[in-house]
Amino acid sequence: MAKKITGYVKLQVPAGAANPSPPIGPALGQRGLNIMEFCKAFNAKTAQIEKGTPIPVIITAYQDRSFTFEMKQPPVSFFLKKAAGLKIGKKPASGSKTPGKGAPAGKVTEAQIREIAEKKMPDLNCDSVDAAVAMIRGSARAMGLEITG
């Protein structure tokens, strides 16, 4: 018989930097999950990924207080900022203050967008790489990035 699922927890955790402080501790504590066990497992799985890369993770909580977790690719905005050479981090915001008007925040090439689309393909809700490229182009425009060649 399969374990009974009691819920899901969605978090975005920096690679190799999971610790019991907020937001991880309270989110897992509410479900009665072992926080340190998750932190150790997550940090071990993300050891080969560049430190500080934001990793979306979906934790499945079971009735017996055990859990499993699934990691996704970093957000598109992270890849776009990296490709454009912008500062990566939450504050200060490194996108354009007024996207579509005035000076662009940075530049990305079509080749970089295609590369990002191929990396993100498993996580995106689309069937073809061309559709993924269109989604990422839209994200780049919304961030105030100029798309070249």
Curated annotation (Swiss-Prot):
Keyword Secreted attached: no
PANTHER family: 60S RIBOSOMAL PROTEIN L12, LARGE RIBOSOMAL SUBUNIT PROTEIN UL11M
Role of this protein: Forms part of the ribosomal stalk which helps the ribosome interact with GTP-bound translation factors.
Keywords: Methylation, Ribonucleoprotein, Ribosomal protein, RNA-binding, rRNA-binding
CDD domains assigned: Ribosomal_L11 (cd00349)
Transmembrane annotation, as ranges: none
Residues spanning the signal sequence: none
Protein name: Large ribosomal subunit protein uL11
GO biological process: translation
Post-translational modifications reported in the UniProt record: One or more lysine residues are methylated.
Domain of life of the source: Bacteria
Oligomeric and partner information: Part of the ribosomal stalk of the 50S ribosomal subunit. Interacts with L10 and the large rRNA to form the base of the stalk. L10 forms an elongated spine to which L12 dimers bind in a sequential fashion forming a multimeric L10(L12)X complex.
Assigned protein family: Belongs to the universal ribosomal protein uL11 family.
Gene giving rise to this polypeptide: rplK
Organism: Methylobacterium nodulans (strain LMG 21967 / CNCM I-2342 / ORS 2060)
A Pfam family annotated for this UniProt entry: Ribosomal_L11_N
Cellular component, GO annotation: cytosolic large ribosomal subunit
Record GO terms (molecular function): large ribosomal subunit rRNA binding; structural constituent of ribosome
